[in-house]
Every structure is written in C-alpha cells, then in structure tokens.
From Swiss-Prot:
GO cellular component, one term: cytoplasm
Organism name: Methanocaldococcus jannaschii (strain ATCC 43067 / DSM 2661 / JAL-1 / JCM 10045 / NBRC 100440)
GO MF: 18S rRNA aminocarboxypropyltransferase activity; S-adenosyl-L-methionine binding
Keywords associated with the record: Cytoplasm, Ribosome biogenesis, rRNA processing, S-adenosyl-L-methionine, Transferase
Domain of life: Archaea
Subcellular compartments: Cytoplasm
Main location as per UniProt: cytoplasm
Keyword Ribonucleoprotein among UniProt keywords: no
Function, as annotated: Aminocarboxypropyltransferase that catalyzes the aminocarboxypropyl transfer on pseudouridine at position 914 in 16S rRNA. It constitutes the last step in biosynthesis of the hypermodified N1-methyl-N3-(3-amino-3-carboxypropyl) pseudouridine (m1acp3-Psi).
Protein family: Belongs to the TDD superfamily. TSR3 family.
Protein name per UniProt: 16S rRNA aminocarboxypropyltransferase
UniProt cross-references to InterPro entries, sorted A to Z: RNaseL-inhib-like_metal-bd_dom, Tsr3-like, Tsr3_C
UniProt-annotated binding residues for S-adenosyl-L-methionine: 21, 71, 93, 112
Recorded catalytic activity of this chain's protein: an N(1)-methylpseudouridine in rRNA + S-adenosyl-L-methionine = N(1)-methyl-N(3)-[(3S)-3-amino-3-carboxypropyl]pseudouridine in rRNA + S-methyl-5'-thioadenosine + H(+)
Amino acid sequence: MITMPKLFIYHANQCNPKKCTSLKMAKMNKAILLKNPYKVPKNSLILNPYAEKALSPEDKEIVEKFGITALDCSWKEAELMFKKFKFKNQRSLPFLVACNPINYGKPCMLSTLEAFIAALYITNFKDEAWDLTSCFKWAETFIKVNYELLERYSNAKNSMEVVEIQQDFLRK
C-alpha cells in the first residue's frame, strides 16, 4: 500500500474546470482542495516557480511531515499570486518539460498534477509519483519524457546540486 504524502491545492478558480488537473485530483481523493489561501498548512512545502531555492531530495522530511502545497492559478496570474502570499518552505522545481495537453512540450509550464508528480519523484517518493499518473491518461508520459532529469535530480545531495544538474543539462 502506497502512503502518499498529503497534497494540498489552493485553487484560485482561474482555469477551465473540465481541463483542471487540480479539481480531478481532489475528486479522486488524491489531494485536498483549499478555497482560501490562508488555510494553506504553514509548514508544508510550497511549490513556487519563483522561489529562490530549488526542490531537492533534502526536502523529503518536510514533505513527509507536512505535505506539499501547490497554488493552482493561471500562468498569467502566477507571479502576482506568489508575491501576494508569503509562505515558509517555498521551493521551485528545476527544468522539466510539460506533457499536459495545454502546454505540451513547453519547458517549465507544468500543470498542478505534473508539479506534484515532479516534487514527489525528486524527493524520492517515486512510487507515489507513479501512482498520481493514474489521474490522467497523459500523465505517465510526463515521467517518461523527463525520466533522465527526474532521476538525476532525485539523486542530488541538495538544492545547489539540483541547480548544477539543471545548468549542465541546459548547456548541452
């Protein structure tokens, strides 16, 4: 039996509900949907594409104890949303390629589901990451396309090493 770390989503209602990965995750009991940003668990790891520190395997303990929170908002509104709320334990995901139908092939334009899969994989909750792919038919493709990078990131010692791996990959 897979013990999934708690996954929280602050949903800003800025998307098409029929295509929303967050709403489907909540419907499948894979994540807890929060309608109020002030209900975000204060010690959870916050996925923030603008955070200065990259997610790394050294964050596993935070994920295990307090879970992961994603803010589901439009990419057009994202920067403003993250500036508006101040959270502890903010981490950015390293370079990965989106495989969702809306942003397929675009670097770093991940859906909330892809962000959770990446965060779980990098913090060495790999079985749990694979389990999340059951939410959408295309989700398994995300791990397959990014497999080499996800493996390298998950073997890094710390955030600095994750950034080095990312820079090395982007130089090639």
